[in-house]
A protein has these predicted regions:
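Conserved H-loop
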Residues: 84, 218-219
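Eukaryote-biased recognition of electropositive, low-complexity segments
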Residues: 221-223
């Protein structure tokens, strides 16, 4: 079975573990923060809250499980960061560690250094929301270039608005934004089903093979 992406180039017959995370929001006071905190430009220091320390522990635990799975399956690791990896400075929020981009860049290096240490075979960066990552996903594009993420060969960009992968004949479809929602108690359980049907029907109307799995983020709600 072939492992391929982009236009179907053969990569490997090795098993693959695909790890997808999103909305990490590096720089938010409600996002993960390393236990040593981060030094501020003025000489002070920001230390993580109890919630942030818990998030950091959960983050490390997740990647430890991924490492164990890769080892058990003798699998290659592919990582997808599905948008809003940075918090930015938006909507007059006070819930940021610092408005200094360098502070958020340091936090991103520490936070995403955890999966980087696992030496993934491929890393894909998906662009998120303008309010968080700037016009045209500028912050995530710069970050993707800095870590030499997988490049979109068609556009030459280091990050992606829409990523389609084919891994061992299994099709994946990745975007940050979703086209449906369901916030009411009686509509929330059906949001994923509505989105699945929309994705399937849009592909069929264009005579395309629908993905086996589609990932959408942004809503901060788990639904399957």
């Amino acid at each position: 079975l072939d492992v391929s992406h982009g236009h179907g180039g053969v990569l490997s017959k090795r098993p693959v573990v695909l790890a997808v995370v999103s909305d990490v929001h590096c720089g938010s006071t409600l996002a993960s923060c390393p236990p040593e905190g981060v030094r501020l430009d003025e000489g002070g220091k920001y230390l993580p809250s109890i919630v942030q320390r818990w998030l950091w522990a959960a983050w490390e635990d997740y990647w430890a499980q991924i490492r164990a799975l890769c080892k058990a399956e003798h699998a290659a690791l592919w990582v997808v960061l599905n948008g809003d990896s940075f918090e930015g400075q938006h909507h007059g929020t006070t819930q940021i560690v610092s408005a200094n981009p360098e502070v958020q860049a340091y936090l991103a290096a520490r936070i995403f250094g955890v999966p980087k240490a696992l030496k993934p075979a491929h890393t894909f960066i998906i662009r998120g929301t303008e309010a968080h990552v700037g016009p045209s996903g500028a912050t995530e594009e710069a970050f993707a270039r800095s870590i030499r993420a997988e490049r979109d060969k068609d556009s030459g960009r280091w990050s992606w608005w829409h990523l389609r992968l084919a891994i061992h004949n299994v099709r994946f479809d990745m975007q940050h934004h979703t086209s449906t929602s369901g916030n009411l108690p009686w509509t929330r359980p059906q949001a994923a089903q509505r989105l699945a049907f929309r994705i399937w029907s849009e592909h069929k109307l264009r005579d395309l093979d629908a993905p086996h799995y589609a990932f959408r983020s942004h809503r901060h709600i788990y639904s399957d």
